[in-house]
Structures are given as structure tokens and as C-alpha cells.
């Protein structure tokens, strides 16, 4: 099922439907837009018919200079069965040739009061958000000091209980159990909760609780950019865990690599506090303050000084 149809654009941007009502369910598969200026001159060799077409003042002013026969020919070529819609900006008058071609092909012809540049920008942002690659990850997403922390780990390791403690400490829950992630940009992942389980948290032995009802609207948020992954795993005595923080793991989600920290879980460890500190330390590293690197440099300086003596 297509993620976006022409009907969605009409509703989202309050566009006026002039003709082609039968085609409002046409799918839109790309966020790229087209301003068919060179096509108006008759060059259709590389016409991107699958894109939303925008006709601004420049295109329609040039169109007025054409002969009647040329106008009919160009508009028939523009209105294909593949084209999602044509949008006329600035509330300009609709050429009769375009109206006729739209009716014959069943292609939606729309109109907006916005300028071409403004509408183009808004359409691109909307379509990129809707058509972005998506995936779902088993885990919990929490906003900690402005850092979107995705807590992962095998079932029963304590992810939801840790999230509950973080919420009690003033942080905000985004999603529990299933985190829907979309890649809005090359390095931007945004996580949210499925509508069915939004603001809900499952605690074994207690059941399902509504975080917003219990802790208020300030304890939840609808979406958050993910910048850090913390993986919880049962403590393995045979495994060597990072004790300095010099080595940085990475986790790839869709096409974006995120910093990953592995936290071993065992009785007596306050995971909520550790994750809080991990988020703050991550922010410090992004600001250029790396405590592990500073310690390493001091250690190397001390060793060199000792060797000189």
C-alpha cells in the first residue's frame, strides 16, 4: 500500500481540486518535485512523469507565448497516467488547454495560494518524512537530558524497569517494546511509538501502565531523534568489558551508524543512574570533552616523565 497519495497532499496543504477527482488516489513514490520549464519548450526526453509537477509564474508566463496547437500538445504530454498531480501556485488562472488535458487523462489538477518556492519546500519536507526508510527495533526509547537513548537487549533483561526508573527521575518516555524508526536524512534517525502502545509501559508482574496518566504529560513525548544506543546484557564473567571508554562501538540502523555502549547487568547495579551518566558523558564527548582520552594522555605523560627520570 502506498505511503502517500495525491489525496493526502490535498488534505495536508489545503489544495483546491480543480479537476481529475478520479485520480486523487494516485500513489506518490518519490519526494523529488518537478518544475516542467524545459518541457514547456517541447523537450520531453527526460520528463520525470512520476513526480509531483509544480507550475509557477515563470512556467505559465512562457506557456502564454505558445501557439494554441503547441499549448494543447505540451499539456497532453504533461498529463500522463503516471503523473500524481499538477499544482498551480499563486492562485494563478488555469489554462484551458491544461484543464482539458487533465479531464481527458483523469490526472488531478490542483491549485495553491502559496508561492512556488515556499510550497516546493513544504512539499519536499512532507514527502521526505512520509517516504523515509523505516524499520522497527525491539527496545525502549527515552529522552535523557535531550539525548535520544535507545535501550536494547534480550527480553527480560530489565529494559522497561530501567525506563520506568528514568521516567521517575524526570526523563521522558518515547516508546516501549517496539520502536518505529525512520531515516529522515543520511545521519538522522527519528524514533516513535506505534499508535497502539503509545505512552504505555509493560512491567513484568505489574502489567501495563500508562506513563502519561501516572506521571503527567511532561513524562512522555511523541518522537525523538536517536543519537545513542545502550545495549543491556546479562553479566558474562568470561567477557572483558570496556573499563576506560576509549573504544567506541557502532551499531548500524538502516544506513546510519550510531554510537553503542554495552552495559552488563547484574544485581546491585543502578542501571538508571549509569544510563543517565552515559547520556551526559556522550553530550560532553560531542562538545569535545573526552574524560577517557584525557586520562590516557595524562597516563602517557606520566609514563614518559618516569622514563626520563
UniProtKB/Swiss-Prot annotation:
Mg(2+) binds at residues 160, 202. Gene3D superfamilies: HprK N-terminal domain-like, P-loop containing nucleotide triphosphate hydrolases. CDD domains: HprK_C. One of its GO terms (molecular function) is phosphorelay sensor kinase activity. GO terms for biological process: regulation of carbohydrate metabolic process. ATP binds at residues 153-160. Its cofactor is Mg(2+). It holds the Pfam family Hpr_kinase_N. Its EC number is 2.7.11.-, 2.7.4.-. It is an enzyme of class 2 (transferase). Residues 201-210 are annotated as: Important for the catalytic mechanism of both phosphorylation and dephosphorylation. Signal peptide: none annotated. Residues 264-269 are annotated as: Important for the catalytic mechanism of dephosphorylation. Catalyzes the ATP- as well as the pyrophosphate-dependent phosphorylation of a specific serine residue in HPr, a phosphocarrier protein of the phosphoenolpyruvate-dependent sugar phosphotransferase system (PTS). HprK/P also catalyzes the pyrophosphate-producing, inorganic phosphate-dependent dephosphorylation (phosphorolysis) of seryl-phosphorylated HPr (P-Ser-HPr). PANTHER family: HPR KINASE_PHOSPHORYLASE, PROTEIN YJDM-RELATED. Both phosphorylation and phosphorolysis are carried out by the same active site and suggest a common mechanism for both reactions. Homohexamer. Belongs to the HPrK/P family. The Walker A ATP-binding motif also binds Pi and PPi. This is HPr kinase/phosphorylase.
Amino acid at each position: 500500500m502506498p505511503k502517500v497519495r495525491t489525496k493526502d497532499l490535498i488534505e495536508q496543504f489545503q489544495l483546491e481540486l480543480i479537476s481529475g477527482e478520479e485520480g486523487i488516489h494516485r500513489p506518490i513514490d518519490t519526494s523529488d518535485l518537478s518544475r516542467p520549464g524545459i518541457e514547456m519548450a517541447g523537450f520531453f526526453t527526460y520528463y520525470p512523469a512520476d513526480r509531483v509537477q509544480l507550475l509557477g509564474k515563470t512556467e505559465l508566463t512562457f506557456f502564454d507565448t505558445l501557439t494554441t496547437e503547441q499549448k494543447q500538445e505540451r499539456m497532453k504530454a504533461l498529463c500522463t497516467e503516471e503523473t500524481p498531480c499538477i499544482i498551480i501556485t499563486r492562485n494563478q488562472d488555469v489554462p484551458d488547454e491544461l484543464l482539458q488535458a487533465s479531464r481527458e487523462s483523469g490526472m488531478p489538477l490542483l491549485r495553491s495560494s502559496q508561492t512556488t518556492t515556499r510550497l516546493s519546500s513544504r512539499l519536499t519536507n512532507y514527502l521526505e518524512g512520509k517516504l523515509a526508510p523505516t524499520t522497527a527495533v525491539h527496545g525502549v526509547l527515552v529522552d535523557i537530558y535531550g539525548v535520544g537513548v535507545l535501550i536494547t537487549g534480550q527480553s527480560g533483561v530489565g529494559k522497561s524497569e530501567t525506563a520506568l526508573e528514568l521516567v521517575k527521575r524526570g526523563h521522558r518516555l518515547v516508546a516501549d517494546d517496539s520502536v518505529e524508526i525512520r531515516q529522515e536524512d543520511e545521519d538522522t534517525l527519528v524514533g516513535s511509538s506505534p499508535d497502539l502502545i503509545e505512552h504505555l509501559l509493560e512491567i513484568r508482574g505489574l502489567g501495563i501502565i500508562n506513563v502519561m496518566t501516572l506521571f503527567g504529560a511532561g513524562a512522555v513525548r511523541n518522537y525523538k531523534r536517536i543519537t545513542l544506543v545502550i545495549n543491556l546484557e546479562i553479566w558474562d564473567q568470561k567477557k572483558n568489558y570496556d573499563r576506560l571508554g576509549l573504544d567506541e562501538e557502532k551499531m548500524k540502523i538502516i544506513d546510519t551508524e550510531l554510537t553503542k555502549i554495552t552495559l552488563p547487568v547484574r544485581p546491585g547495579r543502578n542501571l538508571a543512574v549509569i544510563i543517565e551518566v552515559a547520556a551526559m558523558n556522550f553530550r560532553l564527548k560531542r562538545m569535545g570533552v573526552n574524560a577517557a582520552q584525557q586520562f590516557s594522555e595524562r597516563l602517557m605523560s606520566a609514563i614518559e616523565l618516569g622514563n626520563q627520570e
